[in-house]
Amino acid sequence: MQLNGWDHALKVTADGKGLVGHAGVILLRKAADMTGLTGQLSGALRQKGTSPLLDRGMVLASMAAAVALGATSMSDIALLAHLAPLLGTAPSGPTVRRALDLAGTPRALDRIARARAVARERAWSLIAAASSGFPWLAVAGKVLDGWVVIDMDATLVTAHSDKEGAAPAWKKGYGFHPLGAWCRNTRECLAMKLRPGNAGSNTFTDHEEVLSAALGQVPSRFRRKVLVRVDGAGASHDLIRHLLSLSSKRKTALFTTGWMITEADEDAIRMIPADAWKPGTRQDGTAENDKDVAEITGLLSRAENWPDGLRWIARRVKPSRRQARNLTAYEKQTGWRYSVTCTNIPDLGIAGVPGSHHPQFIDVLHREHAVVETAGVRTAKAMGLRGLPSKTWQVNCGWVIAANIAADLAAWTRLLGCHDDPELRDADPGTAPLPGLAPPRQARPTRPPAHPRHQPRLAMGRCVPDLLAAANRPVGTRMTSTNNPGNTKGGQPGAVGAGAHPVTPGTPAPHHQNQNGHEDQKRKPTQSVTGPRDA
């Protein structure tokens, strides 16, 4: 069975005939093929003694592409029906369910994780070789060159009916409580564990499992310097000991975590001299007003119960009206709201990052973890995790994997296909989906080239500008093609044909009367995609 090669003669035209919808999903499938993910998934889901009509790895990759388009159920695989002339017949809903049921088994989950790691190594190599380079994180105006940042967080997924594993959640909801780990640099979902709704927020075994799986997804050449950030809900003695044990002679693992304030912490804060409080720092490196930071490492009495090598940073801010209801007696007395960050960043700071030893830098570094709510959780819910489609636990585990793969494909498409456009490269799929995923295009067979050219990286960069131009063009703009000599009149490229009215961008199209005397808007050609004859 041919899993890829469907795009060996892919072209973009502007004649507006034979249109298909969701043509931008071609970029996602191209990313899966060029990184080797489709083939790796095929091997991971292959079973001895079976020969399904549709390869299960290809079905899972197709379902991930449909999830990126907004699929919320297994029957939404029909979103890919428009692309049948290019990708072939889309799988049916029952076929998708069987593939997800297979992918949700513990053995298949391990094999899929290894397959994703192999494809991710290829993708990160291509990203690093792009003109923009690998996206290193910048904090307080300082670039963490060479550091891979992993953010861990849990979220609630509501279940609107009885499903296997659903349980009452701590926020008085009902559903599931998955725990995930995201790469802040690329915004990929490295690992995620589906858990019942009543799962704890600071369960060490779950955090250890997800973190180990996430580190296994990081390519070995990028694993030498890793920074892990966890919020206060996930902090525990066991987790901090585990984070400290990750460092070795060959790799450095730093972390920051939130801290549940107790009376001992308030006693340490009371001992801070007034002149020790320094203004905090924003993400751009400028100073904050009425938001101060100070270190309490030597003042904290309960530090004896924790491992050596830790530092504690206190932060105080003026409480809002909403926060004023939950203040402690000491906070009400002082008029400040306090929070504490725990870290193992040494007194000398991070090597190669000037000023990283200051409490202000550590404070802003940990506060940047809040971005996981938008760049991680919101993106995940925009791509399939707003709800789980099945009543069975195993199928829902397979759906979570498909949603994670969809987030990976969207990230690779941004970083490889849009690497030369900072706005599109950093777009948030939750609020600004990739352009070109919905506009109709055309699929038409063409003769394959005699000697196909092999690109050193994703060849989809050739069609991205055309797709983006079509997606961003105003409604009233007349489209022309510089590659189509038929769009010329009188030797002038792009001239308007006889009987047509030229349209300027931003103005409504002209109206014409039909034979019945009614006005109808003249249809305009739309950009299109062509595929091979044997697609």
PLM features: what roles do these ranges have?
Residues 87, 157-159, 188, 198-201, ...:
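Flexible loop/turn segments at secondary-structure boundaries
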Residues 31, 77, 359-393, 398, ...:
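Short amphipathic alpha-helical "interface-anchor" segments enriched in bulky aromatics
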Residues 1-10, 252-374, 381, 468-481, ...:
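An anionic, glycine-rich sequence signature occurring as long contiguous blocks
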Residues 201-264:
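Domain-level cores of phosphate- or acyl-group-handling catalytic modules
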Residues 83, 245, 261, 271-278, ...:
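Short, well-ordered loop/turn and helix-capping segments at boundaries between secondary-structure elements
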Residues 386-453:
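Basic, amphipathic alpha-helical segments enriched in Lys/Arg and hydrophobic/aromatic residues
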Residues 31, 62-63, 74-77, 91-92, ...:
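Short, conserved catalytic/metal-binding motifs centered on acidic residues
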Residues 1-173, 180-200, 205-221, 249, ...:
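Dynamic "connector" segments at or just before major functional cores
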